[in-house]
Amino acid sequence: MTNKLSPAVPPKFQPINTILKTGKSSQLRYIRLGKLLITGFFIIIASLFFLYPQIFYCELIRFSGFHSENNKIYFSPQIQPKSFGRINRTIQKAEFRVDSFFVGQQSRPVIIVCSNPQEYQKYCNSTEGAGCSLGTPWGNSYVVLNEQGMNVDVISHEMSHTELLARFGWWTVATKTPQWFNEGIALMLDRRFVNNPDEIGRYFDYMDEWLYYTGGGQQILELRDIGSIKGFFNASQKQVMLAYMSSGLEVSYWLILSEGRGLEQLMQAMQEGKSFEEAYRQAEEKQRKIMFKKLPTNPLRFQDSKKISD
């Protein structure tokens, strides 16, 4: 009996035109996907420009008609060059104040100096005030100033906001840090309302301001009600001033309890994963019971006062 070997089965080859069609269809899919991604990107950019046009104007400031010698400070073309030196000196004084309070300045915001309400509206998206600050998730920050009302207090106030952005990060400031704390820290550099270099004296002065705006403590604004930007600013002018004074009162009190290292301890604790509330309490814990007997009670903390005295 003889064994007959079966002939080997030849491999199946696809016709060359089938391969070309398959490759072409894959390319078409990638092209369509690329077009969708590009279209989606431009839609997102257009939406962000519609919602936050001031960010885009600030990002493109170097392509505007504003003058700058160092890409750090941009002057409106309407500002005379002879004024540059005076404005630069005012900005430097504000930077020294920030550097002193934070024990070193980490932020390097681009500063835009406007000469009229139209320019200020364009770069700040507001017609109120003499200055504003803007921060981006990608790390850029801007301080927009109105030449007519800018001074060391205004500039250092806004630079305080950009300093917190540099130290804590945009996401932490935007989502985890209450607005009253952000504004309260800024008031420690802004001397338009209280000008007292002594920590305890500053707390007493903010207490006086707070008593004035609350009608002797009759119209208290709780800190939890001014934790968001909307809660802080979406109110009457009198209520906004009360929000500022409440923030100044609380933060000046906290800085006494945290013995000058509060910001550093707060930042470190939050980097370790603690919530703002937990880190804030932890920074003052050591001195809270000691100073409770030495300082007038903070009216924004009556519940805490009861717990300590019990």
Regions found by a protein language model. Name each.
Residues 58-173, 178, 276:
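Juxtacatalytic substrate-recognition/specificity segment
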Residues 173-247, 256-310:
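Acidic/His/Gly-enriched intrinsically disordered linker/tail segments
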Residues 26-44, 92-104, 121-137, 182-199, ...:
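Charged, low-complexity, helix/coiled-coil-prone segments
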